[in-house]
Amino acid sequence: MLLTLYTCLLWLSTSGLWTIQAKGTDTDVSTRNPHRDLAPNNVDFAFTLYKHLVASAPGKNVFISPVSISMALAMLSLGARGYTREQLLQGLGFSLVEMSEAEIHQAFRHLHHLLRESNTTLEMTMGNALFLDHSLELLESFSADTKHYYELEALTTDFQDWAGASRQINEYIKNKTQGKIVDLFSESDSSAMFILVNYIFFKGMWVHSFDLESTREENFYVNEATTVWVPMMFQSNTIKYLNDSVLPCQLVQLDYTGNETVFFVLPVKGKMDSVITALSRDTIQRWSKSLTMSQVDLYIPKISISGAYDLGGIMGDMGIADLLSNRTHFSGITQEALPKVSKVVHKAALQVDEKGLEAAAPTRVSVTAAPGPLTLRFNRPFIIMIFDDFTWSSLFLGKVVNPTEGALPGAKLRLTRAPRAHRKGWEGSP
């Protein structure tokens, strides 16, 4: 029941949402849980970044790990100097008056450790890798600090031979993610001297599994002109559900084993932007208080989704810090002059399938005239948000427009079983 307790504490109130101490005898939050001092800033940054990416990619999938990005940028600040350092930390939402740099990095170290703690019921690989041209040498202070706080792995390569360098980087990331993230780089970038790669892969196990035998091919209505077939998972269960009276959407909250919980949000057709605009800590808190246990026939696509972003340009577009500008200063990274960073790349990947700890109920067959469960089909664009309850972290934020795009290697998303009967056309989608 600890997970339930943590969840209740997490979403108790807006003012205490990111500062309440979980169950324990020590009431000194900063001593016991320094990572929670990061939570408000991390979550606010998460939604700001997510909204920016959604606005810049209309009609496209968006998928990021905000907490992983925050770690990478905070780590990069260790090598920044002057205004660039200030820009990075302020852009992440930190006030150095309220929290010192040492406290920020120590809190991220604690958070990183907690997120990477062993949990045999899920697969999660996250990390940062720095690839440096062999003509450059890291400063000892930067190397030691990034290794201590963020477990950074630094490797040298020959960027004059981009074909060879890209193969080295791709192979490294592939091995680190057990083959889930491949071919991260393919285009030539002869000017590269320094590339930071931030990566994360996640595959959890549901507390209550979906019924494997009930998964069938169904239509997914991408837009008025495009319909694709997806393997649609099914479970009939008592689920946390809300038909929101404030925003035009319905949502469910499902739990993975461990500390991870997932919100699946289904906006009314044509209202996706309205819902995304309203996403905030307050919205999540209100939803969590309003969700009620309901009998639901739930249909969710089996998905394998990923997103890759060059954070350097994105931070500049957001007005945080243009990491690629010659005006930025990263003189705290290498012995030699390094006027700018070539690339800061983020890659996030997620697999969602039927597997769970407890067996799913069999497919429901109505035999009486009594009111049945409500039916909720995620067969049009939806929002997915995964949080870690214990650390109060935004693990993933996603906008799924087309579940068939961005599939990971080896993902089995096609079925041989017959499709379900379904209505045709965008307007016919439930």
UniProtKB/Swiss-Prot annotation:
SUPFAM superfamilies for the chain: Serpins
Subcellular location: Secreted
Biological role stated in the UniProt entry: Major transport protein for glucocorticoids and progestins in the blood of almost all vertebrate species.
Signal peptide (UniProt feature, chain positions): 1-22
Chain positions of site Conserved cysteine within steroid binding domain: C249
Record-linked SMART domains: SERPIN
Keyword Secreted part of the UniProt annotation: yes
Binding annotation for cortisol: Q253, Q285, W392
InterPro entries: Serpin_CS, Serpin_dom, Serpin_fam, Serpin_sf, Serpin_sf_1, Serpin_sf_2
Record-given protein name: Corticosteroid-binding globulin
Similarity comment: Belongs to the serpin family.
Keyword tags: Glycoprotein, Lipid-binding, Secreted, Signal, Steroid-binding, Transport
Molecular function in Gene Ontology: serine-type endopeptidase inhibitor activity; steroid binding
GO cellular component: extracellular space
Top-level taxon of the source organism: Eukaryota
Organism for this UniProt entry: Ovis aries (Sheep)
Glycan-linked positions: N119, N175, N243, N259, N326
Tissue localization of expression: Expressed by the liver; secreted in plasma.
Domain remark from Swiss-Prot or TrEMBL: Proteolytic cleavage leads to an important conformation change. This reduces the affinity for steroids.
